[in-house]
Amino acid sequence: HTMTTNTIHIKAPGCWMNDPNGFIYYKGKYHMFYQCFPYGPRWGRMHWGHAVSEDLVHWEHKGIALFPSKRGDRDGCFSGSAVEQDGKLYLYYTGVSYLLEDPEDTNLCLDDQFVSAQMMITSEDGIHFDNIKDKREIIAPIGEREMGDAAHTRDPKVWRGEDAWYMVLGTHGNDGNGRLLFYRSADLENWSYVNAVSKSGFGWMWECP
């Protein structure tokens, strides 16, 4: 290792890395996913990198877990979370589709011209993810401006409540304030809207709730 190489922190094998995603203890190991662009040292169409550890100190990279492959996430797999149910690993994330690409750089869009859908994928072992067969869109892009923003609604956090599974999303209200959207599910696949929370003075979009 060189003096500038991390030895006890997760670092992408190369290129770009940002948000940690889907941290979970599953089948005897800690799993950490993270936003990455594996084609250059810059932001681009987001993928999910994947690393595992038995002690939270020594990490082994498992390559790319999620990559753009469906209409709902063709331009990026944004941040999200992970849960386990009946031995299966569930990953939830925001898929992005550009409505207007930057003609000078197709990894970017122009003027926030994109929409965001909420996606899920499952794995039986936490290592192999079939990005073609096992992805599905669970919440379509927001269609009612009073509810949220079709572009800036993202970063699903899923957890088990006393009576059901719950999800919270960060979004941007039509009043210019940040907003949280709450959803509920009995089976981790079919989600229904519950309510929203908003407050002025705390930013225009509440990312990564």
Q: Which stretches of residues belong to each language-model region?
A:
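Beta-rich carbohydrate-recognition and catalytic domains
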Residues: 1-208
